[in-house]
């Protein structure tokens, strides 16, 4: 058992939640060769993942010709095994048609019959985080093949020091940031997959932080989110706020996130990407069972993340406007001071 296909072909945040599982595979058996099946959107990140050796681009949705291309590409690699961290009809058919002898996936829905090894997880109960569910699959794989289980630790992504320093200089020059201040990155967009605070709430949060900490706040924005970032900047109306809405792709964006001293967002891809660097993070979540903080906590150290959500209950669980920013600021202020350790630079 050496050549393994690992599948996490959904969104950015979901993909990042699989990195500890990739790390566990490599740490437990460095001889394993991991090939990741990912969509084109996250392929560039997969290529810089230190635990992934090769990348295969997933087929286009509902494109039968491209699906056949993908099946042939996988067959040609002659994998010894596969782990699908995310199972749907597409992945199930792919597993079956690829002819890989060892096929492991969560035991969910009818598609589980297309895998010959399954792990009952009941993820819908959200008793663990997505990253922990992914690692449980890896533990099952390792134990089945008599390989020792080595638990991974963050950070899961480290850039060369010079690369981060160069990116800091670039951001200083282009965004007008101070080299002597801490940098708080705030992502107010939702990416289409998660509810988030209102712009008014984010403005109150940022104003509260700037009143206590003399830092720079960088407003990040993904495709189609620039207008909201500018609106938020106008609401805050502080010269220490800058907008970062242009980059050269996910890898370039990741280099900028590596420069942050703190990252604040809803439960979105950028939150999970930033946590791979083990920088402090603050998240705002819905309180439904499938979206709550426990299920989608990021992959940095436990003590480097705090989360807020609205009260439980059908009428309130999805309404993040019920989160009190004044109450959150008290906890956030203490968290920041603990993370930054000293008041000399704030």
From Swiss-Prot:
Cellular component, GO, one term: cytosol
One of the GO BP terms on file: lipopolysaccharide core region biosynthetic process
Similarity annotation: Belongs to the glycosyltransferase 9 family.
Entries under InterPro entries matching the protein: Glyco_trans_9 (IPR002201), LPS_LOS_Heptosyltrfase (IPR051199)
EC number: 2.-.-.-
UniProt key word Oxidoreductase: no
CDD domains: GT9_LPS_heptosyltransferase
TM region positions: none
Keywords: Glycosyltransferase, Transferase
Source organism, top-level taxon: Bacteria
Pfam families found in the cross-reference section: Glyco_transf_9 (PF01075)
Species, as recorded: Haemophilus influenzae (strain ATCC 51907 / DSM 11121 / KW20 / Rd)
Molecular function in Gene Ontology: ADP-heptose-lipopolysaccharide heptosyltransferase activity
Protein name: Putative glycosyltransferase HI_0523
């Amino acid at each position: 058992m050496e050549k393994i296909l690992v599948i996490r072909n959904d969104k950015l945040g979901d993909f990042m939640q699989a990195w500890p599982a990739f790390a566990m595979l490599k740490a437990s058996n460095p001889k394993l060769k991991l090939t990741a099946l990912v969509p084109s959107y996250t392929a560039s990140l997969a290529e810089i993942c230190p635990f992934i050796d090769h990348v295969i681009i997933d087929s286009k949705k509902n494109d039968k010709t491209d699906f056949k291309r993908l099946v042939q590409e996988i067959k040609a690699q002659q994998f010894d095994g596969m782990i699908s961290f995310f199972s749907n009809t597409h992945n199930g058919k792919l597993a079956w048609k690829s002819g890989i002898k060892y096929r492991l996936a969560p035991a969910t829905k009818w598609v589980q019959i297309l895998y010959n090894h399954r792990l009952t997880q009941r993820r819908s109960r959200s008793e663990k985080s997505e990253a922990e569910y992914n690692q449980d699959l890896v533990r099952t794989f390792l134990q089945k093949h008599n390989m020792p289980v080595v638990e991974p630790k963050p950070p899961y992504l480290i850039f060369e020091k010079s690369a981060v320093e160069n990116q800091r200089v670039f951001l200083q020059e282009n965004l007008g940031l101070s080299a002597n201040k801490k940098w708080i990155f705030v992502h107010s967009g939702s990416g289409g997959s998660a509810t988030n605070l209102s712009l008014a709430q984010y403005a109150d949060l940022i104003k509260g932080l700037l009143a206590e900490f003399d830092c720079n706040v960088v407003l990040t924005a993904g495709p189609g989110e620039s207008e909201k970032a500018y609106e938020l900047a106008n609401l805050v109306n502080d010269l220490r706020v800058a907008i970062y809405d242009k980059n050269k792709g996910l890898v370039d964006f990741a280099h900028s996130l590596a420069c942050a001293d703190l990252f604040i967002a809803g439960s979105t891809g950028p939150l999970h990407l930033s946590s791979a660097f083990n920088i402090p993070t603050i998240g705002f979540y819905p309180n439904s069972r499938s979206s709550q903080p426990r299920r989608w906590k990021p992959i940095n150290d436990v003590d480097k993340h705090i989360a807020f959500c609205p009260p439980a209950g059908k009428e309130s669980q999805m309404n993040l406007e019920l989160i009190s920013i004044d109450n959150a600021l008290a906890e956030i202020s203490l968290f920041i001071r603990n993370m930054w350790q000293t008041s000399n630079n704030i």
